């Protein structure tokens, strides 16, 4: 039978060992007992929750969704993603908890100083959300926590994992790790079937600027190229 492994003192990571792509820390259990695990699943959005929930349920785990994303801006975008996460939870018949505080000012206070750091605002953003998830899990008698952030092929996966493991140790709660990226296309297909809102940027105003400024520069280069071609034809 497959085992879920909770390793002690980072031994397996130190050895570079990965067992079936997932780890749970600080104890050992067999797969049947996973159905009794009380797991808090941080949800970055509805679409990114599709495959993780499917995989967890396949493994006999029934998580509780937890929406805490102070990085999402502007307000209408945050509200859209919150309601979309709630819609997903309702359609999936999954328990759902949401922190409905909109924290633009707090985010900017944290993000602007982080711009000058080596790993920058992304590390700050991961840490803020994963720490709050670990804290909530610890305070509300959850056995473990995870995040749909580990589904995204665009996030800094190993950095997030290290951050989550640190907070698991700090708050005395297990971190359930699984590389959900293997189900990337499956999650996309499921989100479309459920008619979920599929956002075009990570969430923060900085990522929005980066995405659309790149698009604008690309469009400008295309226009300049066309103007040059027309001048040569004249």
Language model features with spans:
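Nucleotide-activated chemistry modules centered on ATP-dependent adenylation/adenylyltransferase
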Residues: 29-234
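Short hydrophobic alpha-helical segments enriched in small aliphatic residues
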Residues: 5-8, 24
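Ala/Thr-enriched low-complexity intrinsically disordered regions
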Residues: 1, 14-17, 29
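Low-complexity, intrinsically disordered regions enriched in charged/polar residues
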Residues: 2-5, 182
């Amino acid at each position: 039978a497959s085992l879920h492994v909770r390793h002690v003192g980072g031994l397996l990571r130190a050895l570079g060992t990965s067992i079936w792509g997932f780890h749970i820390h600080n104890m050992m259990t067999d797969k049947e007992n996973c159905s009794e695990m009380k797991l808090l699943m941080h949800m970055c959005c509805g679409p990114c929750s599709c495959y993780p929930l499917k995989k967890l349920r396949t493994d006999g785990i029934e998580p509780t969704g937890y929406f805490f994303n102070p990085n999402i801006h502007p307000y209408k975008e945050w509200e859209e993603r919150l309601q979309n996460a709630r819609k997903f939870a309702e359609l999936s018949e999954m328990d759902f908890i949401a922190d409905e505080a909109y924290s633009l000012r707090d985010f900017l206070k944290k993000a602007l100083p982080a711009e000058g750091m080596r790993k920058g605002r992304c590390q700050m953003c991961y840490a803020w959300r994963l720490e709050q998830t670990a804290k909530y899990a610890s305070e509300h008698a959850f056995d473990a926590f995870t995040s749909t952030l580990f589904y995204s092929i665009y996030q800094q996966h190993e950095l997030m994992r290290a951050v989550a493991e640190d907070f698991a140790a700090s708050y005395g709660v297990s971190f359930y790790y699984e590389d959900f990226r293997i189900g990337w296309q499956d999650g996309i297909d499921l989100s479309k079937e459920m008619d979920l809102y599929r956002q075009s940027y990570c969430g923060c105003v900085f990522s929005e600027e980066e995405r659309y400024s790149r698009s604008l520069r690309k469009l400008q280069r295309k226009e300049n190229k066309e103007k040059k071609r027309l001048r040569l034809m004249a």
